[in-house]
């Protein structure tokens, strides 16, 4: 968080503070090759540990494989104190109701927390 505070002294800062982060982009549709084209509707890859990675399909059958865990920082006071100019909520697989719950949580009004979450690299820093 100190690195974000230092950076904001020189320019406005934005960070993704909620959502599934993309892990990989493929040139070929991974779902079409295995189960047939689903046009991006609910495709998921499952690894050997049972973790489920949502697959978002885009133009030209490119697929974006999302993290199995959702980045969540609403319950971290450091996120509010670090001085971000903008915080981006990245909705990908959420229902409209879940989007409302997330928004309320980030506006200090809820207690919703995702089932499987990650803090991303916010506590590791950049070397």
Question: Where on the chain are the PLM-derived regions?
Answer:
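Active-site pocket-lining/capping segments in soluble small-molecule metabolic enzymes
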Residues: 1-127
